[in-house]
Amino acid sequence: MRCLPVFVILLLLIASAPSVDAQLKTKDDVPLASFHDNAKGTQHKRIINWCCLIFYQCC
């Protein structure tokens, strides 16, 4: 029972914390979509290379 007030206070603090989106953008900011696209492209290339090395059918 002693932990309940602490738990409620922590929930209120978390809910009132500013989100990442609330930060001001600068000219150097890059959209996250480009990072995700680059990661997907790199992952796809690795899968194709692995497939070519193992099975020789994907090339």
From Swiss-Prot:
Domain of life: Eukaryota
One Gene Ontology term of the molecular function aspect: sodium channel regulator activity
Keywords, comma-separated and alphabetical: Cleavage on pair of basic residues, Disulfide bond, Ion channel impairing toxin, Neurotoxin, Secreted, Signal, Toxin, Voltage-gated sodium channel impairing toxin
S-S bridge residues: 51-58, 52-59
Cell compartment(s), UniProt: Secreted
GO CC, any one term: extracellular region
Residues excised as propeptide: 23-44
Predominant localisation class: secreted
Claim: Signal is one of the keywords in the record: yes
Organ and tissue specificity: Expressed by the venom duct.
One Pfam family named in its UniProt record: Chi-conotoxin
Signal peptide region: 1-22
Keyword Signal tagged: yes
Entry domain remark: The cysteine framework is V (CC-CC).
Cited function: Mu-conotoxins block voltage-gated sodium channels. This peptide inhibits the cardiac sodium channel hNav1.5/SCN5A (33% inhibition at 200 nM, 50% at 400 nM, and 55% at 600 nM). Does not interfere with the voltage-dependence of activation, but affects the voltage-dependence of inactivation of hNav1.5. In vivo, intracranial injection into 9-day-old mice causes transient symptoms, including extension of the body and clockwise and counter-clockwise turns, that last 3 to 4 minutes.
Family: Belongs to the conotoxin T superfamily.
Additional record remark: Negative results: shows very weak inhibition of neuronal sodium channels rNav1.6/SCN8A (14% inhibition at 200 nM), and rNav1.7/SCN9A (7%).
Descriptive protein name: Mu-conotoxin SrVA
